[in-house]
Amino acid sequence: MDGQVTVKRHGDTHFANIGYGYYTFGVSVGYILLLLLLRKRRGTAVPRSRHKLFQMMIDGSPALHLPILLLFLEIAFLGHYSVIDHASVYIKRLGRLSYVLLFLNIFLTLRPNYILSDYTYVQLLPMHMWLSRAISTFGVFHGLAFVIKWQLDNEVSLASKLFNLWNLLGFIVWILLIILLITSTGVIRRRSYKSFYMVHQINAFAISFIVPVHARPGVALPYTITIAVLLGLHALARVSFCMSSAVVHKLSNYQKGSKLVRIKLPRNVMPEHFTPGSHIRVSPYRRSNPLYWLVPSHPFTIASLPDDDHVDLILREHGHFEFEVGPRYSIVHNYEGITALQLGLVNRVTIVVGGTGISLGLPLFRYFKENTDIGYLKMIWTVKSHADLHVLDDFEGIDIFVTQNTTTTPIPGASESWDEIPLEEFELNSMDDLEAEEEHLGESGALLPTTKRKKDPGAINIGRRLDWNVELASFVRSEGSSDQLLIVCGPESLVKDGVQFATDHNIVFYKEVYSF
C-alpha cells in the first residue's frame, strides 16, 4: 500500500513576514516615545539651536523624522531570504509595512492627543502628511510588483490571479491608493481640497478594513484592532466635542471692497479657560448629516480672550464657506496653538502678522498687554487694503502697513503672490464701519455715551513694505535669549521672512501660515 504524501498548503516562507510586522509596530511605538521625550526635555524655553538638524529634530520636521523612521524600518527589511529566489517575500513585506504604519499615521492625527499633549495638532500634521504619502507609495509598489511578477510568470495567468477573491480585494486597495496619491498632489489639492479630503476619508476607512480580509497571513491581531480603536476614538471625539451654535453678529465692510469679516459666536462654544491664540473647527453640517463626516470642517483662530463676552473670529470670506446670521453651525473641536508654557516664559515679544493673521496676533497682543508685565511688546499688522482695518475696534499700540495705496492700485512688487497660498499649506487657513457704529447709535442718530472710539494706531504706513531690520531693530539683542519670542503669522512669504529673521538673530519664534 502506497503511503500518502502530504503537501503543504503554503510554502516555507508563508509566515516569513510575521516577525517584521511586529518589528514595524514596535518601531512605531518607539517613534511615539521619541516624540514624547523630545518635548519633555524642553521643560524651559531655549534659544533656537544654530544646528539646523538638531532644531529640525526638536520641531518634528518630516524632512528629518521620516528618513530616520524609514531607516529603522529598513534595518530589518532584508532578511536571510534571497531577493531573487524569494521576491514574493519582500513584495508581501512591503504590503505589511504599509498597513502596519497606518497605526502610527492615525495616532498622529488624534484630537485631543493626551499622550503627545506637548504638541499641537498642527505641529504633528506635516509628519502625518508625508507618512501618508510613504504608506501609499509602499502599497502601490506592493501591488505593482505582484502584477509584474504574475505577468512575467509563464506558469500562472495574470487574469486568474487578479480575479481571485482575495487578490481582487488587494487590487481594489491598489486602485484606491493610486487615486489617493493622485488627489494628494498639490495641483489637485489647490483646485479642490474638498475632493481630496473626501477621497482621503473614504480611502482611510476602506483600506483599514479591506486589507485584513486580503492579507495572508492575517493582520487582524494586533494591527486591525488597534487601528479600529484609534478610528473609534476619532469618531467619539467628533461626537463628544461637538456643539451646535449660531452667529451672534457679523461685522463686514463689503461696500469698500473688504472681504475681511469679524464673527461673534456665543461665549459657551469655548471652555471657561483656554490659551490665547487657540483654534476651533466649524462645520456647516449637523452630526447626523453624512457630509459632517466626509467634508472637511473649517479651522479658525479665536481672536478674543477668555474674559470677553463673545468668541470672536476674524477671517477672509471666500466662495467655499461663509458665515451667516441665522443658520446653526457645528463647533467640532477646539485646540491649543501656541502653548501656555511658551507664553509664560518670555519677557520680550514682537508679533508680526499679515491679513487674517490678525486673528492670532490680536489676542496674544492683548494677553501680553493686559495680563502680563513683560519688558518689551511690539505688534505689526500688514494688510493689503485700508478697508480691512474695520475689523478692529482698538488700534492702540499696533503698527500698521497698508501695501496698497488709496486708489487700490497694487504697489509694484508688493507681495502679489500672497493670494496664492493653498489651503493645505497649513490646515488652519482662516478663511462697514457703518454697521459697527449702528450698535452704538441712539434713536436720534447720536452716539451713545458708552461708545468707545477707535484709538489711533502706533503708526500707519501706506504703500510701504515691512523692513524687518528697521522695524525690529529695538527688539534684537546682540545675543539671542530664551526670554525673547517672535510670533509671525500670515501668508507664507511673510512667515518665511520672519523665520529667517529669527534664525539670523537666534530668536525663539512661533509661526502659523494663513492666507492673506
Curated annotation (Swiss-Prot):
Residues 238-363 form the FAD-binding FR-type domain. Its main location: membrane. Its EC number is 1.16.1.-. The chain crosses the membrane at residues 18-38, 64-84, 97-117, 128-148, 168-188, 195-215, 217-237. One of its GO terms (cellular component) is perinuclear endoplasmic reticulum. Gene3D superfamilies: Nucleotide-binding domain of ferredoxin-NADP reductase (FNR) module. It is found in: Membrane. It is a multi-pass membrane protein. Probable cell surface metalloreductase. May be involved in iron or copper homeostasis. Belongs to the ferric reductase (FRE) family. AIM14 subfamily. PANTHER family: METALLOREDUCTASE AIM14-RELATED, NADPH OXIDASE. This is Probable metalloreductase AIM14. The lineage of its organism: Eukaryota, Fungi, Dikarya, Ascomycota, Saccharomycotina.
